[in-house]
Amino acid sequence: MKYTSYILAFQLCIVLGSLGCYCQDPYVKEAENLKKYFNAGHSDVADNGTLFLGILKNWKEESDRKIMQSQIVSFYFKLFKNFKDDQSIQKSVETIKEDMNVKFFNSNKKKRDDFEKLTNYSVTDLNVQRKAIHELIQVMAELSPAAKTGKRKRSQMLFRGRRASQ
């Protein structure tokens, strides 16, 4: 009886192990489809190094990586937009975009819509240029870490002051 249970356990391991190949994220199959479409599996693609992977390896801190990832995701959205009418890869593109939505935007539609709005602004549009310059000082203030930490210190000091006076 002991050997029978070992054999059944072994067979179960084999079945579960073989299922692992089929349980990949949906984007893997679709990315392979895009590789075939773009002939991206050829050795000449590796010439002159990588586009994104080397950059991502340079940044270890999560906030820095998010900045780089946002630019990379923006690139892919623009790339996919160029091929939106190509029916042979439409399913692959949509699957990958949806998976990016889940992974990068945490399935937050508002965040994704705002991100796409930002990436779709044309820097050659005069109206966009004027609005961007008009908002520049406020945007720069938002970027400054000193402005954010200064507010936090003030509110902490007020809180501590109240505690001391009580």
From Swiss-Prot:
Signal peptide bounds: 1-23
Keywords: Antiviral defense, Cleavage on pair of basic residues, Cytokine, Glycoprotein, Growth regulation, Pharmaceutical, Pyrrolidone carboxylic acid, Secreted, Signal
BP GO terms, sorted: adaptive immune response; apoptotic process; astrocyte activation; cell surface receptor signaling pathway; cell surface receptor signaling pathway via JAK-STAT; cell surface receptor signaling pathway via STAT; cellular response to virus; defense response to virus
Post-translational modification: Proteolytic processing produces C-terminal heterogeneity, with proteins ending alternatively at Gly-150, Met-157 or Gly-161.
GO MF assignments: cytokine activity; type II interferon receptor binding
Annotated Pfam families: IFN-gamma
Tissue expression remark: Released primarily from activated T lymphocytes.
Superkingdom: Eukaryota
Pro-peptide positions on chain: 162-166
Pyrrolidone carboxylic acid found at: Q24
Basic residues: bias regions: 149-166
Annotated compartments: Secreted
Keyword Secreted: yes
Function per UniProt: Type II interferon produced by immune cells such as T-cells and NK cells that plays crucial roles in antimicrobial, antiviral, and antitumor responses by activating effector immune cells and enhancing antigen presentation. Primarily signals through the JAK-STAT pathway after interaction with its receptor IFNGR1 to affect gene regulation. Upon IFNG binding, IFNGR1 intracellular domain opens out to allow association of downstream signaling components JAK2, JAK1 and STAT1, leading to STAT1 activation, nuclear translocation and transcription of IFNG-regulated genes.
Family stated for the protein in its record: Belongs to the type II (or gamma) interferon family.
Name recorded for this polypeptide: Interferon gamma
